[in-house]
Amino acid sequence: MRTDTSSDSSQSIWSAIRSHASPPLHALHALHASEVEIRGWLIPLDPTEPAADYFLLAADEPCCGGCIPRDPLSCIEVMMATPIAGGSEPVRLRGRLMQLVDDPAGWRYRLEAAERVQESSGSPLSAPGMSRRAFLASGAALGLAACTPGRFERYTDARDAPNPDDSAPTQWRASPGALTIDMHSHAGHVIVSRNPSLGAHRPLTPVSAPMRAGGMNVICLAIVTDTVVTRVSADRKRFEAWRSPEPGELYQLSQTEFARAKELVAREQLVVVTSADGLASAGQSGPCVIIAAEGADFLEGQLERVDEAYSQHQLRHLQLTHYRVNELGDIQTEAPVHGGLTDFGAQVVRRCNTLGIVVDVAHGTYDLVARAASVTTKPLVLSHTALAGHPGARSRLITADQARAVAQTGGVIGVWPSSGTFHDLDAMAHGFRRMADVVGVEHVGLGTDMYGFISPPVFRSYEQLPSLAAALLAAGFSQHETAQMLGGNYRRVFEASLT
């Protein structure tokens, strides 16, 4: 077996990838989303095709043409701008290097928009080859993911920490008694994996340490109860429902997910907040969580299950819909079926108001949000999104009118760190500014959707919280306004909902 040693820079990238499990990986963190050149062996996923725009690049020469590495740290997933032909010699590629999280195919790194750098005569072919879509659809990806689930010990900051010697704005200083709160998080990989070979056995990951390191006091820890019937779409741009659940299936999934949340709380020594008084003391209690559910699919049309989740599982934050049109209403990413919030959905909103559960309308259509706003007696939240002037069809972004509908209840809209919306934390901070210009600072919050994205977001660890706060100050927000958006506003809604 031959090993590529012709390029020091290429070799350093391969070395860093191989040492992935031994943080800190400063070299790779600095390279995330940047253009790199790397040399390796092209491994087509279908050796019979003359050219491919999706393949693996390995550091070492494979033993045979059909040998696909099972170690995700020995290769990089490649998406070419133009299909290229394989060969018996290594190739040099230039593209954008990305770290992946829980990738459906199990890979840890991807080279995007890649182009071949010619080292000898020859030119890329334009014949179509096997695409990633075809590979994922073939089912081969599932077997690979079973061997090597995508999992990171931690993410790191893509934004450099503020330098005291720079002329950057003063760092944010939390006032006594202030709380930082993430309105929407799947921290610790709390949700059951969509990979059936992992399922509920998906390893839990650290939560307390990154929260302490970044100064995050409270997270709304959200289970998800539609994962067994949803999947990543073929174009990898969204999740979609692919089958109807069996009776009782999503309720049973919720029991598994609530149990995982309980296990994570115990393992990480987290404090579960269930009351306004409990939230008030959260700053002195160490890392805290508010138990949440993303999608009320587990109710399966049975209102009494709201009470059960409240009493047995300490549920205090309920998002009505997620990635399937359920009994409560319509979602942004599918064609409308109900015309907005259903009558059952309205009953759930009223029951949450009575019990003391925050109602979250994220993922819901404008019509769902509008009716929920007319029904509720407590402030609503829309926990994770961003503002768009004219959202595309099936977009998760919202219009100004949708944001105002939430704000008019006294509620809060959480700005999320999607890399499809914002290219860095500075851009995300300006997303906060645009939202605040529409609804007012008092109605804007933070919803990281931690570990909930298909592609790595611009906020990937709670250790980045000081950097986000600095970006908000640089965007023109005051210390007090920053404190409001990073927790104070959600605190107001939580206290109002539970009293």
Each predicted region: which residue ranges?
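Short, conserved, surface-exposed binding loops centered on an aromatic residue
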Residues: 29-30, 46-49, 371-374, 403-407, ...
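N-terminal hydrophobic targeting/anchoring segments and the immediately downstream early-domain regions
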Residues: 126-142, 148-337, 392-446, 450-499
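Short acidic/polar capping segments at secondary-structure boundaries
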Residues: 97-98, 116-117, 294-297, 322-325, ...
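Active-site core of metal-dependent hydrolases
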Residues: 321-401, 414-421
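OB-fold and OB-like single-stranded nucleic-acid-recognition modules
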Residues: 1-129, 152-165, 422
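Sec/Tat-exported extracytoplasmic proteins
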Residues: 46, 101, 265, 356, ...
